[in-house]
C-alpha cells in the first residue's frame, strides 16, 4: 500500500465513522503499545444494509486471545451503542482459528459464499443482539 492509498483508506474510514458511526480501529498490545492490527465494523460488501465485523491481526498477536478481546469490544459497540439487530462475519475455508474465535463469542454458521475476484470460499456467520446478550449473561454468571 502506498502512502496515498493509506491516506485514502484513512479518509474513507473517517467518512464511514461520520456517516454510519462505524469503522475499523487500531489494535495494540496493552503492555507495550505495539500496533498489531485492526478490528471494527463495516457495511458487508455483499449487502451494504448488513453490518460485518472483522478482526485482522499480525501473526505476532495470534494465539493470545487478543482477537477475542477485540471482537467482543466491537460487538459490544455494535449491539449496545448502535443498537444493531444482527452482525455478520466470515473467514476463509481452512482458517480454523478464525472459526473457533467466531464460535467462542457466539456467532453461528449460516452459509458459504464465493467472494472476490478469485472466488475464495468463505464461511459466513451471524450473531443477533439477543444471542450476544445471552452469551454475556452466561460469562458474568
Task: Provide a role label for each language-model segment.
Residues 15-21:
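Short loop/turn motifs at secondary-structure junctions and domain boundaries
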Residues 1-12, 23:
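Conserved GNAT-fold acetyl-CoA-binding loop/helix
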Residues 11, 24-141:
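Acyl-donor (CoA/ACP) binding surface of acyl/acetyltransferases
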Residues 6, 14-15, 115-116:
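Alpha-helical interaction segments
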Residues 1-2, 17, 46:
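A short gly/proline-enriched turn/hairpin at secondary-structure junctions
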